[in-house]
Each structure stands twice: as structure tokens, then as C-alpha cells.
């Protein structure tokens, strides 16, 4: 298994990556924004993505987005192929793309919005802190990317103040003065997630 910076030589995997993201969102019922093969290819050609390969077989992927003229960076689209789940690969990909982000954008704040407890745990281990959406980028092009998420109506109903996703932020300036990243409490995050779902998800008619 190798995890490398994606480039033009990996564009043949773009359709499979796009389909894997879409299938994961459908099977898990989670809010994951869809990404077209063309969008993924652009990320690869710009050196803004990492890919995990088991020989010639696709195993995982994640890409970098920058907002506010490089002041904010997001690691998005983290996905592991079903054949390679349950072995800690997602964590390795997350660490690789985070390191790559810090090298390309050393002064940028790195943020994440996610509904997944596993991703929250990985973010917390890297030094991310939970924040309100107002502390994230106000770049409209970022929030436009949420339109393909099935929970987008929640974001619009709350005037972009809250969603089922939890916002998390790594601030390099604050990190210098706060070496303690804190501990991830899964019970607390699970309760927060359940509260959001109960409050914002529309009940299905019987």
C-alpha cells in the first residue's frame, strides 16, 4: 500500500473515486457532497489531492480546497474503497493530506465540516477544535459545494449558521500557544449529532 500526492498519472481513477463517494453517501445515509470525475481530475492535476493505491488497485482518496485567497484550507472528500475499510487507512490518508496542506499553505487555517464520528476523532488528534460555522470561511463558493449534499436544506433553513455537520478548525497560530489538543469524547459527539438530527431532519410521513 502506498499513499502519494496525486497527479496526471492518476486521472484514470477519477470516475471510480467519484462513484465510490456517491455510493458511500447512499449506503451510509450520510451527508457527503458529490464530486464529478472532472472536478477530481482538476485536483489531481493541480497537486491538491492524495491517493492510496494497493498496487494498481484504488484504495482511498482525499483532496485539498483553498478559500479566501489561501487563508482557509479544507481537506475534503475523504473516502476509502469498501475493500480496504476497517484497517486504519482513512487515518493514514487524513494524516498525509493534512501534512500536504500544511506544506502548501503553511499559514492557512485548516477546517473541516463532517457528520462522521471517525473523522471528528481524526481531526481532534491532529489538533482541530470544534467551532461555529461563523468561524469558518465565508467564501460563497465553498458553501455552494454543499448543494449536492442531501442535508443542504438544513443549512439554508438555518441561514448557514448550523447543519448536521460539525465545524472543526486547526489554527496554526493558536496551535503554537496551545500544545494540548484535548481528548476526543465519543459520547459527547454522538449526543451532539443525535440532537442535531432530531432538531433539523424532517420527519418522514407514515
Give names to the regions the model predicted.
Residues 5-8, 80, 114:
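Conserved residues at beta->alpha junctions
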Residues 80, 86-101, 110-112:
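Conserved acetyl-CoA-binding loop-helix of GNAT-fold acetyltransferases
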Residues 102-107, 111-206:
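Terminal substrate-recognition subdomain of acyl/acetyltransferases
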Residues 18-82:
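A conserved beta-strand-loop-helix scaffold within acyl/acetyltransferase catalytic domains
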Residues 11, 83, 87, 117:
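Loop/helix-junction capping segments adjacent to catalytic residues or to phosphate/diphosphate-binding pockets
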Residues 1-17:
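A short beta-loop-alpha structural element at the N-terminal edge
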